[in-house]
Swiss-Prot record:
Protein name: DNA-directed RNA polymerase subunit gamma
Lineage: Bacteria, Bacillati, Cyanobacteriota, Cyanophyceae, Synechococcales
Organism, scientific name: Prochlorococcus marinus (strain MIT 9301)
Reaction(s) the record says it catalyses: RNA(n) + a ribonucleoside 5'-triphosphate = RNA(n+1) + diphosphate
NCBIfam families, alphabetized: PRK02625.1 (NF002729), rpoC1_cyan (TIGR02387)
This protein's UniProt keywords: DNA-directed RNA polymerase, Magnesium, Metal-binding, Nucleotidyltransferase, Transcription, Transferase, Zinc
Residues given in the record as Mg(2+) binding sites: 471, 473, 475
Record keyword Transit peptide present: no
MF terms in GO: DNA binding; DNA-directed RNA polymerase activity; magnesium ion binding; zinc ion binding
Transmembrane regions listed in the UniProt entry: none
Binding site for Zn(2+): 74, 76, 89, 92
InterPro entries per UniProt: DNA-dir_RpoC1_gamma, DNA-dir_RpoC_beta_prime, RNA_pol_asu, RNA_pol_N, RNA_pol_Rpb1_1, RNA_pol_Rpb1_3, RNA_pol_Rpb1_3_sf, RNA_pol_Rpb1_clamp_domain
Cofactor binding description: Binds 1 Mg(2+) ion per subunit.
Length: 634
């Protein structure tokens, strides 16, 4: 590959998909060999020879067209080894090169009659129907040989351009034209099938039609205007891309490289093959039969039937089941066409190009991790040892625990305490990325500090769930390990979950408690009517600090919803604040005791607060203590 080729491959502005012209389709498959021979046309439906198990010449796996099936070896075996590179064998005509060319070299099938492309005919919307301004039902009648279409009305007064005629109607008109007393000089001309469709599309002058439509749009309203706009959009797209409407009718169809539709020998001697080979074989068989019928000047009705069958075979190859009966193989299973391979979730784009499997990644079910901090996630040890294996191996060798990679891998398989200790050191400060599909906004992938956990599930902090739109009913998440230092820094600085509190779309908090957290908070702070409020000063239910309450609760001396008196010198929001206390007592030491509904405040002579006891539940103490403890640590 030259430097200029390298440049064009690696530096481009955009990729454009447009309709291919018949010549371009031929150019894809046609090649001139070093000896000047032009190859590329697939003319035989055979795949491989059942005796020699070698590809048949001019067939769907032909080595002359697609390249050798073995590296640096021609079909007949005359030339072997790399020293014969570029030579074309005089005996079999195969170029001596690498077998991997069979992954990108294409062929083509030259059709004996034009066929319509099913995507443009039966797609939604039907571009053929829109361009010709003919209902889709009528276009189908023409393409599948049910009706004639008038291509040139001639001198006939009753015929109009693009008018549909049944077989009987056309026979009557023919009798009228060829009658002895006929006055028609310019005979009308009709067509049927994809050839007629191609003629109609060739007759379109896009620029002129576009001008006429623009004039018509200014004077029209409602549904008619919408229809005209839809038509002009299609025409403008054709003009802008320099595509011709008649290219929607195929004169040749490309044959994709054989290694993308392989034929594999199974253990029992049988062969497994791609469905595409069966679909291509149907097309070639029908195409060859049609060519033979045309050569021997077979009756028109037989030729027409063969053309219709060729159209149906090409339809099945491009999009099986889009129109007519679905072509099935063994076990009554529908054959996978080119469209089936490309489209959908399991198609080439979404499965293989957009959704590639990447190294240093894993996937598992998520469960709630209530003891985690917001920037942490629980990573199963089994997954961590696999993801961080190169780092662990490096550290094991550096610490002289093992001498080589093989010994390190053996030690890792045992997963003993020594390995786990090294793994713990490796993941310390090494952020990982968690992604939940579908990633609809940038918070769908965030960074976390991993914490080693048992089991096989990833533990996630419940507060980050709204950002991922995740819940714990079986959702799965992917783990990715940033390798480069720049990637790790970026993950820590920009993507860490604790740095993404606000939604980038609205600016509102996206870290909000929901579901379990809300229910838990409610249950923790709920007041149960069946619990009696204790008298102030009761030793069993009066505590000197929040810590004492927590200890008593953990010791199972208190239940969660039990009323208690607890000393608390912090600020208290009380509904009674605007009113005066229920009762005020002057004590012997000149201090003053204010008795409120849910608290007792004691002040000295200078009105300074000495102590405050509040009446609350154990659950509310747990809630407050947890929040105060968390805030004080940050």
């Amino acid at each position: 590959m030259t430097n200029s080729n390298l440049r064009t491959e690696n530096h481009f502005d955009y990729v454009k998909i447009s309709i291919a012209s018949p010549q371009r389709i031929m150019d894809w498959g046609q090649r001139t060999l070093p000896n000047g021979q032009v190859v590329g046309e697939v003319t035989k439906p055979e795949t491989i020879n059942y005796r020699t198990l070698k590809p048949e010449m001019d067939g769907l796996f032909c080595e002359k067209i697609f390249g050798p099936s073995k590296d640096w070896e021609c079909h007949c075996g005359k030339y072997k080894r790399v020293r014969h590179r570029g030579i074309v064998c005089e005996r079999c005509g195969v170029e001596v090169t690498e077998s991997r060319v069979r992954r990108h070299r294409m062929g083509y099938i030259k059709l004996a009659a034009p066929v319509s492309h099913v995507w443009y005919l039966k797609g939604i919307p039907s571009y053929v129907a829109i361009l010709l301004d003919i209902p889709l039902r009528d276009v189908e009648q023409i393409v599948y040989f049910n009706c004639y279409v008038v291509l040139d009305p001639g001198d006939h007064k009753e015929l109009k351009y693009k008018q549909l005629l049944t077989e009987d109607e056309w026979l009557e008109i023919e009798d009228e034209i060829y009658a002895e007393d006929s006055t028609i000089e310019n005979e009308p001309f009709v067509g049927i099938g994809a050839e007629a469709l191609k003629q109609l599309l060739e007759d379109l002058d896009l620029n002129q039609v576009a001008e006429e439509l623009r004039e018509e749009i200014t004077n029209s309203k409602g549904q008619k205007r919408a229809k005209l706009i839809k038509r002009i959009r299609v025409i403008d797209n054709f003009i802008a891309t320099n595509a011709k409407p008649e290219w929607m009718v195929l004169d040749a169809i490309p044959v994709i490289p054989p290694d993308l539709r392989p034929m594999v020998q199974l253990d029992g001697g049988r062969f497994a093959t791609s469905d595409l080979n069966d679909l291509y074989r149907r097309v070639i068989n029908r195409n060859n039969r049609l060519a033979r019928l045309q050569e021997i000047l077979a009756p028109e009705i037989i030729v027409r039937n063969e053309k219709r069958m060729l159209q149906e075979a090409v339809d099945a190859l491009i999009d099986n089941g889009r129109r007519g009966r679905t072509v099935v193989g063994a076990n009554n299973r529908a054959l996978k066409s080119l469209s089936d391979i490309i489209e959908g979730k399991q198609g080439r784009f979404r499965q293989n190009l957009l959704g590639k499997r990447v190294d240093y990644s894993g996937r598992s079910v998520i469960v709630v991790g209530p003891k985690l901090k917001m920037h942490q996630c629980g990573l199963p040890k089994e997954m961590a040892i696999e993801l961080f294996q190169p780092f662990v191996i490096h550290r094991l060798i550096r610490q002289n625990i093992v001498n080589n990679i093989k010994a390190a891998k053996k030690l890792i398989q045992k997963a003993d305490d020594e390995v786990m200790q090294v793994l713990q050191e490796v993941i310390e400060g090494h952020p990982i990325l968690l992604n939940r599909a579908p990633t609809l906004h940038r918070l769908g992938i965030q960074a976390f500090e991993p914490k080693l956990v048992g089991g096989r599930a990833i533990q996630l902090h419940p507060l980050v769930c709204p950002a991922f739109n995740a819940d714990f009913d079986g959702d799965q998440m992917a783990v990715h390990v940033p390798l480069a230092l720049e990637a790790q820094t970026e993950a820590r600085m920009l993507m860490l979950a604790s740095n993404n509190i606000l939604s980038p779309a609205t600016g509102e908090p996206i870290v909000t408690p929901s579901q379990d957290m809300v229910l838990g908070s409610y249950y923790l702070t709920a007041l149960q009517p069946n619990y009696q409020k204790p008298e102030f000063g009761d030793n069993k239910t009066t505590f000197a600090s929040l810590e004492d309450v927590i200890f008593a609760f953990e010791d199972k001396r208190l239940s969660l919803h039990e009323w208690i008196w607890v000393r608390f010198n912090g600020e208290v929001e009380d509904e009674d604040e605007m009113r005066s206390p229920q009762k005020t007592q002057l004590l012997e030491d000149s201090s003053r005791l204010e008795i409120w509904n849910l608290r007792r405040d004691r002040f000295d002579s200078d009105n300074n607060l000495i102590s405050r006891f509040i009446l609350t539940t154990v659950g509310r103490v747990v809630m407050n203590y947890t929040i105060i403890d968390s805030v004080s640590k940050t």
